[in-house]
Amino acid sequence: IWKKKEYVSSVISKQRKYIPLLYNQIFQNILSKTIDNTTLPKFEVKTSSDLHKYTKAEFIRDEKTEQFKYKLIHTPSQTVYSSRPHKFQEGYKIFISTTDKYSVFIDNCGMTQSIVFIICSNEEQAKKYLQILQHPLYVFINNICRWGNFNNIRILQSFPIPTIEYSGNHQELYNYFNITKEEIEY
């Protein structure tokens, strides 16, 4: 069942590193052109427990003060502050939610263990990556591979980086990955 519709089909089995919520020939085609394509460069999605909210709780507070002045992203809706900078405090990053629905955003601060991130070389690259990661294809791939209200970090680490100048026109990325009209409409 996907989007309240029941599907029945057979697909030739192949070894997988993950289990999608639905798997048929169309899904297999989409995944083989994107996250399963080992020839494509992948986003370097990272995690960090440098300032873990619970094991390093003495360094973290909910409110910003003169002592706790370093902004940390805990979840997309929760920001906390630390008394020391995170080892990745500086520089623009794309943050991707792991504990809620798929969402991506840019900031230039640190983080706790509850969110993943991509370090960007500058704000321009961050904006470019953000636009790509918000594309319906990436949202779709994430959503068919999420379990128990959690986004799968291994799937996020398999997201390919297109090597084209993406203008924001969705069809450009579909064309880049050779996604057919039938696959798009699925």
Question: PLM ranges: what are they?
Answer:
Residues 1-185:
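C-terminal substrate-recognition regions of SAM-dependent nucleic acid methyltransferases
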